[in-house]
Amino acid sequence: SLLQFRKMIKKMTGKEPVVSYAFYGCYCGSGGRGKPKDATDRCCFVHQCCYEKVTGCDPKWDDYTYSWKDGDIVCGGDDPCKKEVCECDRAAAICFRDNLKTYKKIYMAYPDIFCSSKSEKC
């Protein structure tokens, strides 16, 4: 669920997820179009593509099972769909962490009007 994803992001990056990522670039948050602005925005693009492949559950609202081990996220549970959603969220949280050095405040609350180029395919 988005609430669990938020917790993963907070723990991985130390940033407040809603403020820092909900409206970042062209792909973070709902929707998405154009070319990702930087590595962080590409994390969101890949995350959206991952969600699009999930069938059988609702990635935004269905809770999944996960835990922390040695600073890493471990997805678990018996439901394959929910586990897949967890893996999507895990990969994005790690991607955000790995790209903290290139995070740009200029892309926070980025206006959609600047995301008008042709969208990439997943």
Curated annotation (Swiss-Prot):
Disulfide bonds join C26-C115, C28-C44, C43-C95, C49-C122, C50-C88, C57-C81, C75-C86. It is found in: Secreted. One of its GO terms (biological process) is lipid catabolic process. PROSITE patterns: PA2_ASP (PS00119), PA2_HIS (PS00118). GO terms for molecular function: calcium ion binding; calcium-dependent phospholipase A2 activity; phospholipid binding; potassium channel regulator activity; sodium channel regulator activity; toxin activity. It comes from the Eukaryota. Keywords: Disulfide bond, Hemostasis impairing toxin, Ion channel impairing toxin, Myotoxin, Neurotoxin, Potassium channel impairing toxin, Secreted, Toxin, Voltage-gated potassium channel impairing toxin, Voltage-gated sodium channel impairing toxin. Expressed by the venom gland. GO terms for cellular component: extracellular region. Its main location: secreted. The keyword Secreted applies. Negative results: does not show hemorrhagic activities. Monomer. Belongs to the phospholipase A2 family. Group II subfamily. Q49 sub-subfamily. This is Basic phospholipase A2 homolog Gln49-PLA2.
